[in-house]
């Protein structure tokens, strides 16, 4: 029997979060359950994803009590700095799209096409460089 993975999308109502959802929809990963999180202001927003209607929920300090395997953070640096360590402390592997951890020596900065092996160095949080850097190192 295949394991089902739980993936939290933080910042799901924003531009980067919606782009992440679009990519995930294109990939149509098997054995994944999704939960969408957003700011208090955007809570209750309905988002069509994978043929279903999801309701984005406010991100709180208790949001990761559900036992997520992974989280994609696309809600800005302040949100990432506050909530990524909470998620990681509960066993969730965080992929952060903000600048919050890019200069942190304990957080690997990963471009999958360039240094995928560095993912193994994570302590619960993985950062990615900004879009200009990614283009420069991939080309």
Model-derived features: where do they sit?
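N-terminal Rossmann-like NAD(P) cofactor-binding subdomain of oxidoreductases
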Residues: 1-139
């Amino acid at each position: 029997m295949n394991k089902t993975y739980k993936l939290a999308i933080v910042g799901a109502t924003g531009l980067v979060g919606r782009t992440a959802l679009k990519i995930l929809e294109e990939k149509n990963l098997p054995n994944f359950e999704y939960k969408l999180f957003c700011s208090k202001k955007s809570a209750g927003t309905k988002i069509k994803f994978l043929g279903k209607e999801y309701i984005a929920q406010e991100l709180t300090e208790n949001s990761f009590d559900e036992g997520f395997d992974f989280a994609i953070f696309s809600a800005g640096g302040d949100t990432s700095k506050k909530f990524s360590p909470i998620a990681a402390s509960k066993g969730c592997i965080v992929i952060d799209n903000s600048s919050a951890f890019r200069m942190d020596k304990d957080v690997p900065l990963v471009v999958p096409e360039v240094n995928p092996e560095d993912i193994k160095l994570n302590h619960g949080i993985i950062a990615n460089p900004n879009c200009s850097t990614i283009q420069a190192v991939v080309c």
